[in-house]
Structure formats: C-alpha cells, structure tokens
C-alpha cells in the first residue's frame, strides 16, 4: 500500500522544515519562532502537532473549506448584476454598498463590493490616484463664522433633462450644506433665493465667501487714484449691497484654488446626487428641487463634522 501524498503550501512547507530543525535540536524554539514570525507558544503548538501527525500537522484545518460567513454564489451574482445594470450605473464601491443596503436590503461592505468587481474584471468608477500633496486651509472654528457660496452646472438628470446648475451654501466649520437650490443657470436671482433660504432656515452668518463672478462684484470695482483721493468707495453689485444690508461680510476669493473645499464637495455631489436623483425617478428641475431637503439631510448625516468651537456664530434674520 503506497504512502498518501501530502500537498503543502510554501508557507506550510517552511513551517514544517523550521520546526523539524528544532525537533532535531539544530535550532532552539526561540530561533524557530523568530524565523517564522510567530510567538513561542504558537511554534510549541506546531511542534506538538508535527510530533503527533507528521507533516499534516502544519496544514490548517479550514483549508479547502468555504468560510461560514462567505457570501452565497447567488448573492454574488445578484451584486454583479447590480454593478452592470442601469439602475446603479456609474456608482463607486462605497456608494453602491450604501445603496444596496438602502434599496435592496443587501448588507455588504465596500471592500466586498470591490473584491466582487475585481473578480468580475469590472473597472472601478474612478482610477485610484495618490492624494495630491497640498496644504488644506484650516476650517473656521464656529458654525456660521464663514459660509461658502458657489454654483455647479452639470447634467444632474443625465439625459432626462437639459443641464442646469446647483447653487449651494456650505458652512466652512462643519462642511454642512446649509441650503441649496437648482436653477436653470447660475444667476443673481438664484443667489438671492439661496441667501433668503439660508437666513430663514439657519440664520445669518458672519461672512460669506464667493468667487469673483460678476454676480458678486461690480464691473466698476476698481477706483482711480483721483476717486480714492476724493474718498469714493468701490461700488457694490446688487447682491453685494444686499449682503451689506444684512450685516454679512463678503469675502472674494482671488484664485480657484482658494475654493478647493467647496469644489471637492461639488465633485462628491455630482458623483452621488446624479445616481440618487435617478433612483428617485426625478425628470425635471422642479422635481429635483422638491427632493433637495432629503438629499441635503442624507449628505449632512454622512459627511458633516463637528466644529472645533461648539458656539454658533449666527444671528436671526
């Protein structure tokens, strides 16, 4: 009767050889533990198993067994179908994990989604790039100390409607979306609406931070030397005058890089809200505006941070 063949992995073979040297007194138990990167107690257990079972003593008893917590193949197939279907099209791994739990009652981690995607040879939504080395501006300490206003034109409803703009007010200390509105384009009326909503729902902030769009500044915002000597002040835009009357300081950004935080927020919203609006069946700008409170609440619940100073820098309208 022939001997049974034993198949060992490279790691198992190394463990068997090292423990065998120990058993032959070629090395000590401490040296065996160091060579294998194990504790002395672990190598002692291996030695006892090999003494009793021979080479099979290094084979893990779960080898070849399907883990008890492994996903059923049928569930993996369902997840792959969701990955390639229209419903969750263009969804990243983290967002898909959230949406499957919310809409399909499928609880799987983003890392599980990623493993299934890689095994199915499906590309990621975005290539992973190393983070850029840049110095982030420190957040303001108090909620309401600074609110950033900006707009983002985008195909928010994909091919179900023409592109339109999202105007949003973002608190700098917390990252909260204070309020937002969808508009056909970025315009003065839209920012008046945004500011009124902000004042009514959250109060009046100390300062707002915007880009240098003509909505926010007068085309005649540079004075001649003669005008400066005469004591004339820079004329304000219609929106700038409204901020002055509300007692809100208006800070203009000098470079697009100065608005990095709000620009990154809009990238996140474009990634997520396009899919969320699709799942809601939204087909018009008016319907999109009705869904904004729900979208804002969900975003703030997931992404807002606590301010470093709990006091609020807000006064009522």
Describe the predicted segments one by one.
Residues 199-231, 254-256:
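Acidic/histidine-rich, metal-coordinating catalytic segments
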Residues 102, 106-107, 118-177, 184-206, ...:
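Mobile-element integrase/transposase regions
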Residues 10-16:
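Short alpha-helical elements of helix-turn-helix
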Residues 18, 32, 43-46, 54, ...:
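Mobile genetic element proteins and their domesticated derivatives, centered on retroelements
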Residues 22-24, 87:
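Short amphipathic helical patch at the helix-1/turn junction of helix-turn-helix
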Residues 232, 238-316:
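Charged alpha-helix within mobile-element recombinases
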Residues 1-3, 9, 20, 29-84:
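Short, basic alpha-helical/linker "hinge" immediately adjacent to a nucleic-acid-recognition surface
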Residues 54-155, 226-234, 313-317:
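Basic, flexible linker segments flanking DNA-binding modules
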């Amino acid at each position: 009767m022939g001997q049974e063949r034993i198949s060992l992995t490279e790691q198992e073979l190394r463990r068997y050889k090292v423990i065998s040297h120990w058993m032959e007194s070629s090395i000590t138990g401490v040296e065996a533990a160091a060579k294998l990167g194990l504790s002395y107690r672990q190598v002692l257990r291996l030695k006892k198993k090999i003494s009793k079972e021979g080479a099979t003593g290094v084979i893990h008893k779960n080898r070849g067994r399907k883990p008890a917590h492994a996903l059923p193949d049928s569930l993996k197939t369902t997840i792959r179908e969701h990955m390639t279907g229209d419903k969750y099209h263009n969804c990243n791994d983290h967002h898909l994990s959230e949406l499957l739990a919310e809409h399909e009652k499928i609880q799987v981690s983003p890392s599980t989604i990623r493993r299934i995607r890689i095994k199915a040879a499906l590309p990621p939504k975005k290539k992973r790039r190393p983070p850029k080395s840049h110095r982030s501006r420190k957040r303001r300490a108090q909620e309401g100390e600074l609110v950033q206003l900006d707009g983002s034109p985008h195909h928010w409803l994909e091919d179900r409607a023409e592109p339109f703009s999202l105007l949003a007010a973002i608190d700098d200390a917390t990252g909260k979306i204070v309020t937002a509105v969808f508009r056909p384009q970025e315009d003065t009326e839209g920012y008046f609406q945004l500011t009124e909503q902000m004042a009514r729902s959250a109060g009046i902030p100390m300062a707002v931070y915007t880009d240098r769009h003509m909505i926010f500044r007068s085309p005649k915002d540079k004075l001649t030397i003669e005008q400066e000597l005469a004591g004339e002040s820079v004329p304000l835009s219609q929106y700038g005058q409204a901020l002055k009357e509300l007692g809100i300081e208006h800070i203009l950004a000098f470079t697009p890089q100065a608005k990095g935080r709000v620009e990154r927020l809009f990238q996140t919203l474009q990634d997520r809200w396009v899919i969320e609006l699709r799942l809601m069946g939204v087909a018009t700008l008016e319907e999109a505006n009705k869904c904004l409170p729900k979208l804002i609440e969900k975003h703030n619940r997931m992404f807002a941070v606590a301010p470093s100073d709990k006091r609020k820098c807000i006064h009522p309208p």
